């Protein structure tokens, strides 16, 4: 049922102009076996099922392909392969919503509204529901971090010799930062500049490797985290005027598909991806 609702919302969110995605040809560079290759990883965030994560990366690839003809020659000369680095939903990830329901005795829907300032919550109550499960690096699963780091290392090393771009969403940004740090703390370290990050809706205070990020001013979840942890990266984009803001499915302005369905956030994210891929194209991983 949840997947059906998600699919319905995705279809509604894409404008009629987006329907051209279905007619977009594959990347010309991918037809050339000698063309350099970059793996673009999507790392999902909080309470994202595997099916939802696949929808998210599909949306990302379609938006990228739609704009590829207008991107730099360096990006077009590369074959950009999209891949999912999935974070299983469970355990501490689900604790975010469980805390909202059990500790505060409210539904997640009402929780969003309360955090928007429509009612009076104390900072302590918000902290109890948010601070630990969502932002505490100690609660991130170590085996998942190791698996992510290994996936990036395998792409960069011979015989793959690929560059890596990571696009994490929500808590996926914390996993990505941790995997990046692990990757470069264990020998042999990848060549400098072979990994770039473009974060979306990040609860983190930094982007590893001096990467880029986009967080919307209307992202209720990240705004709530910033209330407790002021050093959380500030908002630097928005969803503009869009029906998504009136949708019951827009997830408090935090949805990845929402970020890629509304402007200027969509344009900003794709611009960051283009600049990151352009920089990666100048690096030889092997």
Locate predicted features.
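Serine-dependent carboxylesterase/thioesterase catalytic core
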Residues: 134-226
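Active-site catalytic motif of lipid deacylating hydrolases and related acyltransferases
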Residues: 27, 32, 36-162, 244-263, ...
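Boundary at the C-terminal end of the N-terminal hydrophobic targeting segment
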Residues: 20-24
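Lipolytic serine-hydrolase domain surface
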Residues: 54-58, 101-102, 190-286
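Bacterial N-terminal signal peptides that target proteins for export
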Residues: 1-6
């Amino acid at each position: 049922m949840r997947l059906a609702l998600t699919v319905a919302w995705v279809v509604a969110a894409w404008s009629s102009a987006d329907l051209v995605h279905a007619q977009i040809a594959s990347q010309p560079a991918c037809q050339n076996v000698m063309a350099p290759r970059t793996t673009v990883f999507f790392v999902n965030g909080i309470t994202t099922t595997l099916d939802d994560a696949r929808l998210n990366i599909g949306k990302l690839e379609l938006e990228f392909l739609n704009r590829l003809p207008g991107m730099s020659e360096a990006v077009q000369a590369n074959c950009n392969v999209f891949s999912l680095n999935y974070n299983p939903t469970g355990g501490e990830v689900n604790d975010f919503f469980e805390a909202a329901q059990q500790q505060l005795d409210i539904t997640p829907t009402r929780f969003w509204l309360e955090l928007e300032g429509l009612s009076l919550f104390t900072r302590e109550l918000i902290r109890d529901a948010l601070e630990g499960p969502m932002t505490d690096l100690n609660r991130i699963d170590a085996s998942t971090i190791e698996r992510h780091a290994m996936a990036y290392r395998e792409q960069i090393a011979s015989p793959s010799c690929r560059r890596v771009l990571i696009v994490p969403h929500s808590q996926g940004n914390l996993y990505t930062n941790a995997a990046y740090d692990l990757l470069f703390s264990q020998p042999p370290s990848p060549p400098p500049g072979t990994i770039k990050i473009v974060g979306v809706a990040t609860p983190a205070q930094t982007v590893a490797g001096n990467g880029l990020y986009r967080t919307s001013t209307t992202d209720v979840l990240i705004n709530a985290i910033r209330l407790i942890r002021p050093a959380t990266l500030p908002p630097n984009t928005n969803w503009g005027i869009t029906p998504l803001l009136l949708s019951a499915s827009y997830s408090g302005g935090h949805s990845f598909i929402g970020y890629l369905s509304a402007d200027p956030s969509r344009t900003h994210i794709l611009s960051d991806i283009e600049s990151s891929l352009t920089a990666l194209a100048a690096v030889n991983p092997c």
